[in-house]
C-alpha cells in the first residue's frame, strides 16, 4: 500500500504499487506487506533528524518492523515501512537523467532492500551489488 501525504509532486500510485508487488516477488516476499508513504521535504527532514541525526531531507528512509524482519527471519506479515520524499526524488531524477517514476521505483527497491537487512554503509558492497542486479532484472538500468 502506498499513501501520498504530500501535495507538491503529482505521483501516479497504481504503477508504483504494481512495481512494489513485483519487487516483493523478485525478493521472495510474497504474502508480506510493505507500507510506503510519500512525504513532504519538511516531514522527511524531521524523520531524518529524529532517526538518523542528520539535517535536511533525504530521498528514502526504511523502518523495519522488527530486528527479525531486518535479518530476514521474521514470520510477521509486515516487514516494515518506507518513507519517500518525491521532491528530493524529482531533484535526483533530474541530476541523474532519469524520469521521476523510474527514480521512485529505484527508491522503492532500495527501501525494501534495507527492510530486508541490507546496509550499504556497512556491508562492503553487498547491497550495492544486489541492487544493481535487481535494477537490471526490473528494467531500471
Segments and roles (model prediction):
Residues 1-102, 113-141:
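An acidic/histidine-cluster motif and surrounding catalytic segment
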Residues 106:
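Conserved SAM/SAH cofactor-binding pocket of Class I
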Amino acid at each position: 500500500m502506498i499513501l501520498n501525504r504530500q501535495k507538491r509532486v503529482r505521483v501516479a500510485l497504481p504503477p508504483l504499487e504494481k512495481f512494489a508487488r513485483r519487487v516483493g516477488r523478485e525478493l521472495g516476499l510474497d504474502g508480506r506487506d510493505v507500507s510506503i508513504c510519500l512525504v513532504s521535504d519538511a516531514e522527511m527532514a524531521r524523520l531524518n533528524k529524529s532517526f538518523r541525526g542528520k539535517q535536511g531531507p533525504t530521498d528514502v528512509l526504511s523502518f523495519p518492523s522488527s530486528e527479525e524482519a531486518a535479518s530476514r527471519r521474521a514470520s510477521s506479515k509486515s516487514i516494515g515501512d518506507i518513507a519517500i520524499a518525491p521532491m528530493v526524488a524529482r531533484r535526483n531524477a533530474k541530476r541523474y537523467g532519469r524520469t521521476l517514476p523510474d527514480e521512485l521505483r529505484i527508491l522503492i527497491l532500495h527501501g525494501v532492500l534495507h527492510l530486508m537487512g541490507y546496509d550499504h554503509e556497512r556491508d562492503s558492497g553487498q547491497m550495492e551489488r544486489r541492487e544493481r542486479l535487481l535494477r537490471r532484472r526490473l528494467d531500471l538500468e
